[in-house]
Amino acid sequence: MNGRVDYLVTEEEINLTRGPSGLGFNIVGGTDQQYVSNDSGIFVSRIKENGAAALDGRLQEGDKILSVNGQDLKNLLHQDAVDLFRNAGYAVSLRVQHRLQVQNGPIGPQGEGEPSGIPIAMVLVPVFALTMVAAWAFMRYRQRL
């Protein structure tokens, strides 16, 4: 592993119907409350259990909301974004950016000829120690003869 974290970024249109608890999620971010360094976007901070977003299942905590009913959320104060969501109506269309962390390394069984991931020293040191003990025991045995 090289210590780098890679992300796969995808966008999706999600249509939600407002329920008794609203759209069923909380937001963070905005130009006055940056949630992500160098990004003043609006992000999902919490999905409410049994809310519209949870029942739909596609919106996830950490998703960036790009637009609400076609209105861009760039460069908005947090409260302006909250007001936009509150006044969005009964049927709400969200343009969302998902950031999925990509695993840095193999995800399945390793093929033939691929390294096992065990450092060679973890194998060689015990083998070397065992060889030394065997050599010492052999030398002691020969001295007795």
From Swiss-Prot:
Subunit relationships: Binds (via the PDZ domain) to isoform 2A of SYNJ2 (via the unique motif in the C-terminus). Interacts (via C-terminus) with RALBP1. Interacts (via PDZ domain) with ACVR2A (via C-terminus) and ACVR2B (via C-terminus). Forms a ternary complex with ACVR2A and RALBP1. Interacts with MAPK12. Interacts with DLL1; enhances DLL1 protein stability, and promotes notch signaling in endothelial cells.
GO biological process, one term: endocytosis
CDD domains given in the database record: PDZ_SYNJ2BP-like (cd06709)
Domain PDZ: 13-100
Localization terms from the record: Mitochondrion outer membrane; Cytoplasm, Perinuclear region
Record keywords, A-Z: Cytoplasm, Endocytosis, Membrane, Mitochondrion, Mitochondrion outer membrane, Signal-anchor, Transmembrane, Transmembrane helix
Chain ranges passing through the membrane: 118-138
GO CC terms: mitochondrial outer membrane; perinuclear region of cytoplasm
Main location: mitochondrion
Source species, domain of life: Eukaryota
InterPro entries registered for this protein in UniProt: PDZ, PDZ_sf, Synaptic_Scaffolding_LAP-MAGUK
Intervals, Cytoplasmic compartment: 1-117
Protein topology in the membrane: Single-pass type IV membrane protein
Protein known as: Synaptojanin-2-binding protein
Function description: Regulates endocytosis of activin type 2 receptor kinases through the Ral/RALBP1-dependent pathway and may be involved in suppression of activin-induced signal transduction.
Mitochondrial intermembrane side: 139-145
